[in-house]
């Protein structure tokens, strides 16, 4: 009786409360019983539902339109109603194409291991990575919250200074026969970078090579004309010193207002590299700025950068030499513009440059010339990666009876096959043809074929022999295969040739052939072992050969 009386009283009270609030509020209760019991109560204004007193059922007054999106909550009011999403007037719905969708991948032979999947994110452990020899301010690759910052350049471009000194030390032993002479030597080279980071976008960088100068390295010859001699070389000159930053970020700091643009800049004694170093690879005194990250739906351009640059000193071009045939790096200026464009599932690079010969006189002057370049890189059918590069030097009219040093064009075609191991096993076949005297814009004595094959590049340390890389009045190719294994080793085998037009040109005495090989192995995270070998057969000239062993220490 007590229970029954209590139940009746509670029901009476609840019915009374419902009548009092019936004009304004409704209480809906949902009890759902399964493994977990869910009790749901919702107080809401009665505007969208009606009550059938006879059945005691809540019903909608109006059925919602079909375009209305619902997120059902268990309540008859469905408060999750949303309006249809708005579409930009420039956008259009696309047609559904069933062929573009496939079933999920199936791996019947692989058992899904939850623990192994978690390790991808949570199983990381620290390792003893190489450290710079000097870290001041805060360490490189540090974790956790950012450290102390300063408002020296403004609250929106915070100063957080960091000084790093890093680089590598190279030492090699080599037996080189360049045809004219045979040398056995032990040589060394030190690359030293000093980087002062100011803000997240601004820094000052300096590069030094203290133990080599003018291609003379710290070395000891144990075979050759200077047998038994030790050459100690010290060079206190700076190889590069420049400022790099972003005008937009600097403006934000100075005005305390966020800028709406990016404008990267650099100036000083600065290095530049374009077209993988084939067109420009040098450090000169000058400046550059870039208009970055542009796009054009109309022309199917997903990303585009345009860079303008100029140099007024230390400009090295093989077209500007003195009477002894040495490059005059202080006698010319360079001005240019280059663009990088991602479009139509490919990559385009194009550029224009002008070398201004500053020399006046009756002997050597007026060696100015224009330089154009363009390239297109794309993968075809998932089987072939291809790059086509063009270089054109024109407009040079030297004074008197001096011979042109930059006038002609070259076309390079680089191909590699996409194998079942596309990142590590790479067969390649690169071809070239050059007419007259094509020249890079700025890159010293190296020719346009530096990256065509390993037979066309030296080592920058021992004077390792190579085939002629000028591509002047010649054609040829380099065919080889590269294997990177598990990315800890590299093996390359290559056959290359240079064929001058008519069997002989002004710069190439005859046909050239070479077999080359390279082995490289990272012994650990600091030491790298590398060996190179070449055997060259030269028409109308002495043959060449070389073998070398190098150890490189990173720090």
What does each model-identified segment do?
Residues 340, 349-378, 387-402, 439-532:
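Outer membrane beta-barrel transmembrane domains
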Residues 542-555:
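Outer-membrane beta-barrel "beta-signal"
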Residues 116-127, 158, 181-309, 547:
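Outer-membrane beta-barrel channel domains
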Residues 153-155, 191-193, 242-244, 288-292, ...:
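Outer-membrane beta-barrel architecture
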Residues 1-182, 193:
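N-terminal periplasmic/intermembrane-space "pro-region" immediately following the signal or transit peptide
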Residues 149-165, 195-205, 247-263, 294-307, ...:
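Short loop/turn motifs that connect adjacent beta-strands in outer-membrane beta-barrel proteins
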Residues 264, 270-449:
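Signature for the C-terminal beta-barrel architecture of outer-membrane proteins
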């Amino acid at each position: 009786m007590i229970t029954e009386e209590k139940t009746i009283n509670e029901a009476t009270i609840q019915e009374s409360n419902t009548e009092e609030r019936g004009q304004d509020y409704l209480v809906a209760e949902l009890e759902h019983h399964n493994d977990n019991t869910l009790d749901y109560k919702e107080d809401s204004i009665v505007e969208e539902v009606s009550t059938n007193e006879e059945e005691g059922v809540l019903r909608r007054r109006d059925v919602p339109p079909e375009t209305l999106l619902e997120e059902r909550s268990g309540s008859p009011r469905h408060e999750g109603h949303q309006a249809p999403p708005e579409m930009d007037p420039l956008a259009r719905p696309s047609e559904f194409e069933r062929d573009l969708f496939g079933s999920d991948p199936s791996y019947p032979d692989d058992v899904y291991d939850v623990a192994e999947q978690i390790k991808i994110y949570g199983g990381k452990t620290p390792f003893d990575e190489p450290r710079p020899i000097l870290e001041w301010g805060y360490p490189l690759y540090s974790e956790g919250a950012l450290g102390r910052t300063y408002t020296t350049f403004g609250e929106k471009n915070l100063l957080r200074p960091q000084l790093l000194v890093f680089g590598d030390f190279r030492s090699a032993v080599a037996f080189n026969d360049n045809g004219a002479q045979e040398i056995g030597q032990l040589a060394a080279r030190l690359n030293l970078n000093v980087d002062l980071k100011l803000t997240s976008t601004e820094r000052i960088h300096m590069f030094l090579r203290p133990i080599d100068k003018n291609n003379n390295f710290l070395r000891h010859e144990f075979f050759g004309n200077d047998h038994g001699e030790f050459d100690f070389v010290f060079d206190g000159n700076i190889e590069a010193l420049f400022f790099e930053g972003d005008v937009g970020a600097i403006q934000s700091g100075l005005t305390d207002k966020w800028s709406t643009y990016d404008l990267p800049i650099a100036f000083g004694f600065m290095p530049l590299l374009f077209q993988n170093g084939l067109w420009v690879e040098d450090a000169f005194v000058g400046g550059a700025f870039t208009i970055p990250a542009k796009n054009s739906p109309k022309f199917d351009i997903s990303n585009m950068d345009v860079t303008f640059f100029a140099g007024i000193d230390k400009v090295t071009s093989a077209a500007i030499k003195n009477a002894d045939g040495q490059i005059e790096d202080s006698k010319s200026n360079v001005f240019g513009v280059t663009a990088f464009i991602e479009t139509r599932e490919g990559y385009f690079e194009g550029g224009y440059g002008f070398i201004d010969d500053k020399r006046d006189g009756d002997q050597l002057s007026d060696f100015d010339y224009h330089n154009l370049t363009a390239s297109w890189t794309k993968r075809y059918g998932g089987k072939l990666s291809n790059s086509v590069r063009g270089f054109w030097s024109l407009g040079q009219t030297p004074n008197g009876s001096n011979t042109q040093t930059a006038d002609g064009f070259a076309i390079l075609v680089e191909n590699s096959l996409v194998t079942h191991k596309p990142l590590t096993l790479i067969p390649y076949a690169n071809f070239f043809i050059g007419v007259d005297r094509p020249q890079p814009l700025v890159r010293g004595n190296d020719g346009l074929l530096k990256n065509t094959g390993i037979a066309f590049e030296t080592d920058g340390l021992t004077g390792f022999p190579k085939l002629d890389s000028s591509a002047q009045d010649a054609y040829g190719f380099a065919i080889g295969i590269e294997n990177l294994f598990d990315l800890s080793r590299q093996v390359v085998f290559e056959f290359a040739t240079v064929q001058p037009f008519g069997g002989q040109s002004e710069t190439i005495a005859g046909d050239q052939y070479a077999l080359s090989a390279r082995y490289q192995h990272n012994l650990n995270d600091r030491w790298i072992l590398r060996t190179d070998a070449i055997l060259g057969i030269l028409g109308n000239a002495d043959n060449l050969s070389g073998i070398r062993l190098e150890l490189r220490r990173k720090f």
